[in-house]
């Protein structure tokens, strides 16, 4: 630790950038996780050949001295070299506008440079796979611009498919169901909707036929334009909405009545089993000697009644 002490001012220059002035792979030795959450640099150890790597995005102080002179309004100072065309275009205007333009250009250059160095570091470390998303140190424009085209393509595909799906039910329901094979798009739709749409008059036919026959047969013939009855029975197999209410559960009063009638009809089969324990038979005659009064019935009555 003591041998690495003179490297600290080189790694942490007191510049206007603050935390951004660190090299991308380096982290402070006085490490706190609260700072690391706000720090845009990835929490990875530096590569072994840190000195020989040419990309160190430590921006020197002289660029910011030039920028300070331009912001003060000195016309003799030329703008920084990487962006001459916008600076020369705005040279005819007031120096305040030129200073603003150079400030925006410098900030965009800094973010671009850090993004490129981060990408190089990720490629060297093997972090660039398909599921990787960059950390929050990059701005939203720079994280998006690689994936915008794919997302737009997926959105267009999904919207096209949903529009097609919305058009198909209207076309299939407008066609009469006497010829279900006439609309070819019906096969591509879901089986649930197509089956129930063609077989909807099925329950009405079954209820009308199950009634008093000849009166309802004439009214049932009105439904024959929807197709032959055999077709509806075959299509309505498992998918149609049938008027089936399930096995109805008998009420408890009906159950008690049925049990009472059964016991009256077959007294031999419904005899309770006799207990062979002599103690119980001895105690069975005891309740006959008691004379029960009406107030005792409250105690002897079971709770379910």
Swiss-Prot record:
This is Putative monooxygenase p33MONOX. It is found in: Cytoplasm. Potential NADPH-dependent oxidoreductase. May be involved in the regulation of neuronal survival, differentiation and axonal outgrowth. The modification Phosphothreonine is found at residues 44, 175. Residues 1-20, 36-96, 156-278 are annotated as: Disordered. Its EC number is 1.-.-.-. Residues 169-185 have a biased composition (Low complexity). A motif (Flavin-containing monooxygenase motif) lies at residues 67-77. Keywords: Cytoplasm, NADP, Oxidoreductase, Phosphoprotein. One of its GO terms (molecular function) is oxidoreductase activity. The modification Phosphoserine is found at residue 183. One of its GO terms (cellular component) is cytoplasm. It comes from the Eukaryota. Interacts with NELFB, NOL12 and PRNP.
